[in-house]
Amino acid sequence: MLEVADLEVSYGAVKVVRGVSFRVAEGEIVLLMGPNGAGKSTIAMTIAGLLRPDAGTIRFRGESLAGPAHHVLRRGLSMVAEVRRICPLQTVEDNLLLGAFIHRHDRRRVVDAMTEVQELFPVLGAKRRALASTLSGGEQQMLAVGQALMARPRLLICDEPSLGLSPRLAQELFTRLERINREGVSVLLLEQRVSIALPIARRGYVIETGRIVLEGTRSELGRDPRVIESYLGGVREDVRAASDGAARVA
């Protein structure tokens, strides 16, 4: 579905993504993990068309996102940015409708998408008339995901979706992402909280200083000493705090 090959991106004279290649197949959740400053957000923004790469190719559903049809192709993907892009003085419902408006959906598709999002996140339905500014941090993050889903994407890119959330709320959000995936949406998950994120991924990649340094299945990465030491050892409090005990590495 998504194929990134030899991607290079710079900010001025500073190279921040260096020859990165990875793929997300139809129906997969793929985790791209790494520390702050590794280049994860830059990769997400480049795929979404917000940054121009220096080199490399990005193909979505077999077509180049640098080609003449890239605007149409990008309607099939949505991104939940690290910084929430919601309007605090608009209602929850209006924020959701904004996600559909950007992708120019017809009324029937908007109604269907609204129903699906409110079933996935009941709190958004219950608070649809409330201002977004009155929501808790966890609810605002669910609103950001719901807004992205209003586009009814084939691929959902989530950049640090658990940022600022408690372990319990992060686990709840990832459980929702699993459900979204079961309903046919592929997910590219960019995260630091590997102890909670890795269990829902089929495969993963480790990125450091702009390069992919390790890749493998969930089980392979969960057993790798480098991942255990660098990405699992420091966040075991998250694992212990998960309310349902589901945050385990297979």
Feature roles, as predicted:
Residues 12, 92-112, 120-125, 216, ...:
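ABC-type ATPase nucleotide-binding domains, specifically the catalytic core motifs of the NBD
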Residues 156-160:
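Catalytic Walker B motif of ABC-type/P-loop ATPase nucleotide-binding domains
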Residues 48:
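Helix-to-loop junction immediately C-terminal to a conserved catalytic motif
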